C-alpha cells in the first residue's frame, strides 16, 4: 500500500498518524537544513498526475535532494516553483518520449520563464529503487528549454510517442511547430497519444 512504500523510501516523513509530510514541508525542512539528505523527497504518494502517460498510478513520485538543488542553482528555478510541480504536471500540455533515455518522458508544462521559453519536466518512469526494488517515478529535472520546437520536431521524426493532456493551452507557450505535429496535438485529431506513422496512416 502507498504508506508502506513511502516508509521504505523515507520513513522519517511518515507521521505517527500514518500521513505523509507534504512536499512543501519537506522543502521547508531542506531550506532550514533539517531534511535528511540521504533520502529522496516524496513529491506525491502516487502518480495520478501522470495518468495520461502511464497506467502505473500507484508509483510514488520522488525527486532527489541533489536534483532540487541543481534545479535552483543551475536553472534558477526556485523552491516555490518546484513545490508546485505535481499540480503543474497534472495541468501539463503534453509529453513525449525522451530521445536520450528510453524510460524517460519530457513533460511540457503550461509555464514559461522570464524570456518566454517553455519550461519542461523530465520524469523517469518505473525506476526500481533500493533493496526492495520499489517501483517509483522520478523527476530528474525541471528547466527552461530554448528551441523546444526543434526537439519536438526531431522526436516526432524519430517516430517516438507523444501524449496529449491539456493541449488546448498549447498557444500559451507560443512556439512554432511543423504543421503535421500541430494538427496531431490539436483537438481535431482524435488520438490521445500518437507517433508519426500513426498520424500518417490516419
Where are these regions (language model features)?
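Ribonuclease/tRNase effector modules and their secretory precursors
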Residues: 1-202
Amino acid at each position: 500500500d502507498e504508506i508502506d512504500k513511502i516508509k521504505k523510501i523515507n520513513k522519517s516523513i511518515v507521521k505517527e498518524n500514518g500521513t505523509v509530510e507534504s512536499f512543501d514541508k519537506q522543502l521547508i525542512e531542506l531550506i532550514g537544513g533539517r531534511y535528511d539528505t540521504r533520502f529522496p523527497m516524496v513529491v506525491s504518494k502516487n502518480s495520478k498526475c501522470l495518468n495520461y502517460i502511464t497506467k502505473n498510478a500507484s508509483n510514488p513520485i520522488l525527486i532527489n535532494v541533489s536534483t532540487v538543488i541543481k534545479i535552483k542553482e543551475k536553472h534558477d528555478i526556485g523552491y516555490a516553483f518546484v513545490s508546485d510541480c505535481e499540480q503543474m504536471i497534472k495541468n501539463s500540455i503534453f509529453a513525449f518520449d525522451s530521445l536520450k533515455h528510453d524510460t524517460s518522458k519530457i513533460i511540457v508544462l503550461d509555464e514559461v520563464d522570464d524570456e518566454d521559453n517553455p519550461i519542461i519536466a523530465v520524469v523517469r518512469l518505473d525506476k526500481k529503487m533500493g533493496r526492495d526494488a520499489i517501483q517509483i517515478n522520478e523527476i530528474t529535472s525541471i528547466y527552461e528549454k530554448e528551441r523546444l520546437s526543434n526537439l519536438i520536431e526531431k522526436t516526432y521524426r524519430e517516430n517516438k510517442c507523444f501524449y496529449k493532456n491539456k493541449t488546448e493551452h498549447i498557444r500559451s507557450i507560443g512556439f512554432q511547430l511543423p504543421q503535421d505535429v500541430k494538427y496531431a496535438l490539436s483537438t481535431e485529431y482524435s488520438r490521445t497519444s500518437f507517433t508519426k506513422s500513426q498520424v500518417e496512416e490516419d
